[in-house]
Amino acid sequence: DIVLTQSPASLAVSLGQRATISCKASQSVDYDGDSYMNWYQQKPGQPPKLLIYAASNLESGIPARFSGSGSGTDFTLNIHPVEEEDAATYYCQQSNEDPFTFGSGTKLEIK
């Protein structure tokens, strides 16, 4: 299985500043020119919400302050400017190889 290592495990960012979350895959998640890495946001008591798919594509209805980048094994989620409602746990997920796997999560606190 592909192992996804997220960092940091938690971070605290001031309102209006930038949050950066990294995800490193144990092997490439690229196929035929696309990177099969997705990012989810989860708040307590709610199911995960898809933010970014295929590394850099913003899901419909998600604010443009969320952005994703990367390819191969190294990926990044940026949130800028951070808003209070962004406090949540964020997960990367690869969908290149079955079983699809998730990172261990990054908890974002807004200061």
Curated annotation (Swiss-Prot):
<dbReference type="InterPro" id="IPR013106">
    <property type="entry name" value="Ig_V-set"/>
</dbReference>
<keyword id="KW-1064">Adaptive immunity</keyword>
<protein>
    <recommendedName>
        <fullName>Ig kappa chain V-III region PC 7043</fullName>
    </recommendedName>
</protein>
<keyword id="KW-1015">Disulfide bond</keyword>
<feature type="disulfide bond">
    <location>
        <begin position="23"/>
        <end position="92"/>
    </location>
</feature>
<dbReference type="GO" id="GO:0002250">
    <property type="term" value="P:adaptive immune response"/>
</dbReference>
<dbReference type="InterPro" id="IPR036179">
    <property type="entry name" value="Ig-like_dom_sf"/>
</dbReference>
<feature type="region of interest" description="Complementarity-determining-2">
    <location>
        <begin position="54"/>
        <end position="60"/>
    </location>
</feature>
<feature type="region of interest" description="Complementarity-determining-1">
    <location>
        <begin position="24"/>
        <end position="38"/>
    </location>
</feature>
<feature type="region of interest" description="Framework-1">
    <location>
        <begin position="1"/>
        <end position="23"/>
    </location>
</feature>
<keyword id="KW-0391">Immunity</keyword>
<dbReference type="GO" id="GO:0006955">
    <property type="term" value="P:immune response"/>
</dbReference>
<dbReference type="InterPro" id="IPR007110">
    <property type="entry name" value="Ig-like_dom"/>
</dbReference>
<feature type="region of interest" description="Framework-4">
    <location>
        <begin position="102"/>
        <end position="111"/>
    </location>
</feature>
<feature type="region of interest" description="Complementarity-determining-3">
    <location>
        <begin position="93"/>
        <end position="101"/>
    </location>
</feature>
<dbReference type="InterPro" id="IPR003599">
    <property type="entry name" value="Ig_sub"/>
</dbReference>
<keyword id="KW-1280">Immunoglobulin</keyword>
<dbReference type="Pfam" id="PF07686">
    <property type="entry name" value="V-set"/>
</dbReference>
<feature type="region of interest" description="Framework-3">
    <location>
        <begin position="61"/>
        <end position="92"/>
    </location>
</feature>
<dbReference type="InterPro" id="IPR013783">
    <property type="entry name" value="Ig-like_fold"/>
</dbReference>
<feature type="region of interest" description="Framework-2">
    <location>
        <begin position="39"/>
        <end position="53"/>
    </location>
</feature>
<dbReference type="InterPro" id="IPR050150">
    <property type="entry name" value="IgV_Light_Chain"/>
</dbReference>
<dbReference type="GO" id="GO:0019814">
    <property type="term" value="C:immunoglobulin complex"/>
</dbReference>
